[in-house]
Amino acid sequence: MTVIEVEASGPSTPVEAEASASPADTTSPPSDAEATPSEDVAALRQEVESLKAQLEFSQAKGRETMERLREAHERAKEAQERTVRHAADLENYRKRAQKEKEEVQRFGSEKLLKDLLPVMDNLDRAIDAAAKSPDLDSFEKGVAMTRKSFEDALGRHGVKGFSAKGQVFDPRVHEAIQQVETADVPAGHVAYEVVRGFYLNERLVRPAMVVVARAPAEPVAAAEPPAVAEPATATTDTEAPAAPAQSENSSGGSQ
């Protein structure tokens, strides 16, 4: 076929060319239109499923959060109840302690009093015996026994006396009220004990009042008698007037 034949076989006018091409153009768009709705439906379904999954996850998290809040509320409620109970227990303990303190202040010396009452009974018996019998020896023995029972009663409560006579003076446990010169006791030692000291459970409750020894003062030496003039001193005194005479002779010779 020649070129002239090809050109003759093609469309002669633009309208014919458009008419010949129109069937192909009208058939292609419907295929695209048919595919679009199915893709949209699939995308919508996928989005719905995603939203449902997110909703279920959010609901699950919400239920979990609510459960945690409920548990936290229960724990807070229990903690508050415990705090209220502890506060009540503390208040009750404070009241009991205050009551016990008041009882100790009022009746703390009850045991000591029970131990001292027999001492008073012994003193009453000693006074009655002295009134009935003037025997001083028996009275002295009774007083000594009463004193011993009194000291034993104090000892049961931790009270203990101590002797200071002959000891080195210690200002921590001794109170000096006087000093005395004596050679019988070393200086700085206790010569006499006026009042005994006492301990209460190793604590000093009263120092011992004592008189402290001091070394006797040395005697003052006797005054020496005045010195007597010696004879040699007298001779010197007699020779003293001779000097002026000699001076007179010497003065005459010079004349």
From Swiss-Prot:
Disordered: region residues: 1-41, 218-255
GO cellular component labels: cytoplasm
Biased composition annotated in UniProt, kind: Low complexity: 16-33, 218-245
One BP annotation, GO: protein folding
Cellular compartments annotated: Cytoplasm
Keyword set, alphabetical order: Chaperone, Cytoplasm, Stress response
InterPro entries: GrpE, GrpE_coiled_coil, GrpE_head
SUPFAM superfamilies (UniProt xref): Coiled-coil domain of nucleotide exchange factor GrpE, Head domain of nucleotide exchange factor GrpE
GO molecular function terms noted in the UniProt entry: adenyl-nucleotide exchange factor activity; protein homodimerization activity; protein-folding chaperone binding; unfolded protein binding
UniProt KW Cytoplasm keyword: yes
HAMAP family reported in the protein's UniProt record: GrpE (MF_01151)
Function: Participates actively in the response to hyperosmotic and heat shock by preventing the aggregation of stress-denatured proteins, in association with DnaK and GrpE. It is the nucleotide exchange factor for DnaK and may function as a thermosensor. Unfolded proteins bind initially to DnaJ; upon interaction with the DnaJ-bound protein, DnaK hydrolyzes its bound ATP, resulting in the formation of a stable complex. GrpE releases ADP from DnaK; ATP binding to DnaK triggers the release of the substrate protein, thus completing the reaction cycle.
Quaternary structure and partners: Homodimer.
Family: Belongs to the GrpE family.
UniProt-recorded name of the protein: Protein GrpE
Species annotation: Myxococcus xanthus (strain DK1622)
Upper lineage: Bacteria, Pseudomonadati, Myxococcota, Myxococcia, Myxococcales
